[in-house]
């Protein structure tokens, strides 16, 4: 992450602008802190990774999920590859291809002026979607990719994956989905895969995604929901419950969408996963 990238961030406590205080490594952030110009709070940066999390405000459920994902991080990719086909009835790639078109990346067009387009993945995890973004984006388009996660373990796996990535760089940071460290309306696409069912406050998480998305842009959320066609199957009920042990009811959070959400589509993309797409219209619409 460069100094210019850091200028696109905002204080997660007050949303004020941040200034970097510390050392640089080949023009990228090294170690130091991002200090808020408004509230003067300092947010640490270690080895180029900003940590923009107010730990006192992280919900208990999210703390638990962070510990779980930190522990599972080294096993996440191989276990997913092995178990996804027999449980989901399709390959991992086919399931991801079920929601990627909802981002409508091919319809992106350059902004007026020199500002690049920006795409945010909330809960980037081990970075499995990064190559799919690169695949679906127009090649000559100036696009910044941003990814955040609460789990240091998953971000470490993501950074390892990106060492071999030959496309656009992914700007990574540690952050809480309930308090995204960005100004309002600064992303041209926002999406999240596989975590909102474990959020302490899903309504707040959806509101934050909507806040940082530009008006009328697709916001795509994917997580666990048992396909109605398999709800009478004891096997699938047991397996789904094991997969979602942390949540009393894992369903598409349509009821938690921000007021005024339009273009709402909730669909099943595999046996155990839904895809929810919505937009927030312009205020003058």
Model-predicted segments: where are they?
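Class I SAM-dependent methyltransferase SAM/SAH-binding core
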Residues: 118-179
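N-terminal auxiliary segments of SAM/dcSAM-dependent transferases
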Residues: 2-67
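A short SAM/SAH-binding and catalytic strip from SAM-dependent methyltransferases
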Residues: 189-201
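A short acidic, Gly/Pro-enriched loop at the edge of an enzyme's catalytic core
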Residues: 178-190
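Conserved class I S-adenosyl-L-methionine
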Residues: 53-113, 128-132, 136, 154-157, ...
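A short glycine-rich, Lys/Arg-flanked "PGG" loop and its adjoining helix->strand segment in the class I
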Residues: 203-215
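Short beta->alpha hinge that forms the Motif I/post-I loop of the SAM-binding pocket
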Residues: 150, 201, 224
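C-terminal alpha-helical "lid/dimerization" subdomain adjacent to the S-adenosyl-L-methionine
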Residues: 220-277
């Amino acid at each position: 992450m460069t100094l210019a990238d850091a200028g696109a961030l905002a204080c997660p406590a007050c949303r004020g602008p941040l200034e970097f205080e510390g050392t640089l490594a080949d023009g990228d952030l090294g170690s130091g802190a991002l200090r808020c110009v408004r509230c003067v709070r300092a947010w640490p940066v270690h080895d180029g990774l900003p940590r923009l999390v107010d730990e006192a405000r992280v919900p208990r459920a999210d703390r638990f999920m962070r510990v779980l994902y930190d522990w599972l991080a080294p096993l996440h990719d191989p276990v997913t590859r092995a178990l996804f086909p027999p449980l989901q009835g399709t390959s991992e790639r086919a399931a991801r291809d079920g929601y990627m078109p909802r981002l409508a990346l091919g319809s992106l067009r350059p902004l007026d002026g020199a500002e690049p387009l920006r795409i945010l993945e909330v809960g980037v995890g081990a970075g499995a979607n990064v190559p799919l973004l690169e695949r679906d984006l127009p090649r000559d388009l100036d696009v910044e990719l941003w990814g955040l996660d609460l789990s240091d373990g998953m971000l470490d796996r993501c950074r390892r994956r990106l060492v071999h990535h030959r496309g656009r760089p992914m700007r990574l940071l540690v952050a809480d989905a309930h308090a995204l460290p960005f100004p309002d309306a600064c992303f041209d696409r926002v999406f999240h895969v596989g975590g909102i069912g474990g959020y302490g406050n899903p309504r707040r998480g959806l509101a934050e995604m909507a806040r940082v998305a530009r008006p009328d842009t697709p916001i795509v959320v994917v997580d666990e929901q048992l396909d109605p066609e398999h709800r009478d199957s004891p096997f699938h009920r047991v397996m789904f419950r094991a997969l979602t042990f942390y949540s009393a009811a894992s369903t598409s959070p349509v009821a938690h969408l921000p007021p005024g959400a339009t273009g709402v589509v909730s669909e099943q993309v595999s046996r155990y996963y839904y895809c929810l797409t919505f937009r927030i219209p312009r205020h003058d619409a």
